[in-house]
Amino acid sequence: SSTSSDSSSSDDFSGRFSLDPDDGASLQYVPGAASIPEIEKLKNLHPTTGFVLRTEDGQEVGGPKERSSYDDVVAAFGQPVSSTDSANPGDGVNVWATDNGDIMAFFRNNVLTDITFRLRGGDANHQSTGSISKSDTPKTALERLGKPYAIMRSENGTSYVYKDSNGDESSFSTQGNKIFNVTSAAETKQLKKITGLDKNQ
């Protein structure tokens, strides 16, 4: 069986990926986004790795990076329903329950590093990313696939996860208005096996 070489060979590193923070522009194309206020709030947050390039005099390269604190996320979504460290919620993982789904956010030193929004009803839309490629726009891909099972934001990209009728996950990742990665269900399974995330193996 041949695997898709779409995600690796030929295109050079710079074409696939830049170090610019992703602005979450593709979020506006999520079907029904206008009636899901959490999506606009997600777009206004600034996850960051905390990795900062500095010049010799200590200035941040490209100007100070925008960040979102634990308090910013609380301002957006209210108090979390659970925290890995309730005494110090700005370090660790916090979970919010909202009208339109669940949110899980990771923090380090009070700075938001990653945030995942699992959309209510998204698991009923049995789709996979097999029909899209990096030459599609995020708008086309989201129109074709419909409501995602989950949306993940990190500093360098916004990812959309789908679950097919077998419960297998696949995803695509966007930066600005480009798709820079498509991961099939088979590749996702392989990754889970390698990283030990798949407990069924």
Where are the language model's segments positioned?
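Acidic, proline-/serine-/threonine-rich low-complexity intrinsically disordered repeat tracts
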Residues: 1-11
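A short acidic-to-branched-hydrophobic micro-motif
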Residues: 115-117
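A low-complexity, Ser/Thr/Gly/Pro-enriched, surface-exposed linker/loop concept
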Residues: 119-135
